Curated annotation (Swiss-Prot):
Cofactor note: Binds 2 Zn(2+) ions per subunit.
UniProt lineage: Archaea, Methanobacteriati, Methanobacteriota, Methanomada group, Methanopyri
CDD domains (alphabetical): DHOase_IIb (cd01318)
GO MF term list: allantoinase activity; dihydroorotase activity; zinc ion binding
HAMAP family: PyrC_classI_A (MF_00220_A)
Source organism per UniProt: Methanopyrus kandleri (strain AV19 / DSM 6324 / JCM 9639 / NBRC 100938)
SUPFAM superfamilies per the UniProt record, alphabetical: Composite domain of metallo-dependent hydrolases (SSF51338), Metallo-dependent hydrolases (SSF51556)
Family: Belongs to the metallo-dependent hydrolases superfamily. DHOase family. Class I DHOase subfamily.
EC number of the protein: 3.5.2.3
Gene3D superfamilies reported for this sequence: Metal-dependent hydrolases, Urease, subunit C, domain 1
GO biological process terms on file: 'de novo' UMP biosynthetic process; purine nucleobase catabolic process
Protein's recorded name: Dihydroorotase
Active site residues according to the UniProt entry: D297
Length: 426
């Protein structure tokens, strides 16, 4: 049953500050906010003492693998997992088969997402060359990329020599274009038997050189480009100097090659986990406010035994909200900035002024979290047999409810049942 009028009462993060308020949503939009509204509703949620309502997260970088003939995953399976973690909006990357590199394949993928996704999926158009970039811009794609500058899983590299022509099709008021900043010429294609060998194959200079070259192109061709999953504080510094936005992943902030078993294939990912000093430098950049967004780079793979045989990529879109709140609780990031990294900042980059805040006139997408530590369990998200590095990890801020328009989900019950459980209105 749809709850056309939802009334939320309790502690709510509004404008970056925690306030005792009531929020009324009607037909999927926030229509009133006040200390006491005296309004009737189809469903009223009164928050508990340790519960806090925040804008529902936006994950700027996921791979749902749909369409793709070789994966048993897709929009249905992956967006259900995101929903179980309280996420309401994701941007899906284009390394699929077929890739959305023409208006036709782009529209087909959008339709596939509309038919199967449990939450909103923003489809990113695939960049192959300047012609397809031009066609996708004309077709209305407002996100392009991830543009791979080095070969990765299911993603051939876009030759560096073609980038100036691609940049000519971009503009300061054009689509957000997301880049994977590793340079193919500096990446080795040798087999790797452990994380150390994988790291050696994809060294830091492959990233910093790519970032520097992209910064030069940005100066020459003004555009809205964004660097995803950067792993080095030097990369952040170069990007900031060129007014380029960046995101980092939870796995690059929480793990390094010294904190995990180097032969564990779960942690094989591109770009690779770095050393401890790189990870701590990246955390310092986050605390300084130099990193714009926290994004998961959710990339599902079935877990295999042999390190060499395992594709690169990990899942984690389900825990993007607890990851942000853990940065607040344990690493000194303010609550305002921690939540902004997964809400209003990605919304601004996407040009979506209907998302990212609890405010009148915004979409009613709000997640309720219990502000306490909890243990992440892979089985609660259907991640038992996949590359999920967060199993057993203690995090802060357990998602317990999700308001997504006219639907209100009980997330704890949903995780228990393994499917969305909608709260009934009166």
């Amino acid at each position: 049953m749809l709850a056309l009028r939802v009334l939320l009462k309790g502690k709510i993060l509004i404008g970056g500050r925690v306030r005792e308020r009531e929020v009324l949503a009607e037909d999927g939009w926030i229509v009133k906010i006040g200390k006491r509204l005296n309004e009737e509703a189809d469903l009223t949620l009164e928050l508990g003492k340790r519960e806090l309502a925040v804008p529902a997260p936006i994950d700027l970088h996921v791979h749902c693998r749909d369409p793709h003939p070789d994966y048993p995953f897709g929009f249905k399976t992956e967006t259900r997992r995101f929903l179980l973690g309280g996420v309401a909006t994701v941007v899906d990357m284009p390394n699929t088969r077929p890739a959305p590199t023409t208006p036709e394949t782009y529209y087909e993928k959008e339709e596939l997402a509309r038919e199967n996704a449990e939450i909103e999926v923003i489809v990113a158009g695939g960049v192959r060359d300047s012609q397809c970039t031009k066609e996708l811009v004309e077709a209305g794609a407002y996100v392009l990329g991830e543009v791979f500058l080095a070969t990765s899983t299911d993603a051939p590299a876009v030759p560096w020599s073609t980038l100036p022509e691609i940049f000519r099709e971009l503009s300061p008021d054009g689509p957000l274009t997301i880049f994977h900043p590793e340079l193919d010429e500096l990446v080795a294609e040798r087999p790797a038997r452990n994380l150390y060998e994988h790291l050696k194959n994809r060294p830091p200079e492959a990233e910093t050189t790519a970032v520097g070259l992209l910064a030069g192109l940005k100066v020459r061709y003004p555009s809205r480009i964004h660097l995803s999953h950067v792993t080095l504080p030097e990369s952040v510094k170069i990007a900031k100097g060129a007014d380029i936005t960046v995101d980092v992943t939870p796995h690059h902030l929480f793990f390094d090659v010294l904190r995990v078993d180097p032969e564990d294939p779960v942690f094989k990912v591109n770009p690779p986990l770095r050393g401890r000093h790189h990870r701590l430098g990246l955390l310092r950049a986050v605390r300084r406010g130099d990193v714009d967004v926290l994004a998961s780079d959710h990339a599902p793979h079935i877990l295999e035994d042999e390190f060499e045989d395992v594709p690169s990529g990990v899942t984690g879109g389900e825990i993007i909200l607890p990851a942000a709140l853990t940065l607040h609780r344990r690493f000194g990031l303010s609550l305002r900035d921690a939540v902004a990294m997964i809400t209003c900042r990605p919304a601004k980059l996407l040009g979506r002024d209907d998302l990212g805040e609890v405010a009148v006139g915004k979409r009613a997408r709000i997640t309720v979290v219990r502000m306490r530590e909890f243990v992440v369990r892979a089985e609660e998200f259907g991640e038992e047999d996949r590359k999920f590095p967060y199993d057993g990890m203690r995090m802060f801020g357990e998602p317990v409810k999700l308001i997504d328009g006219t639907k209100v989900y009980d997330l704890k019950e949903s995780r228990r049942e393994g499917k969305p459980v909608i709260l009934e209105g009166e």
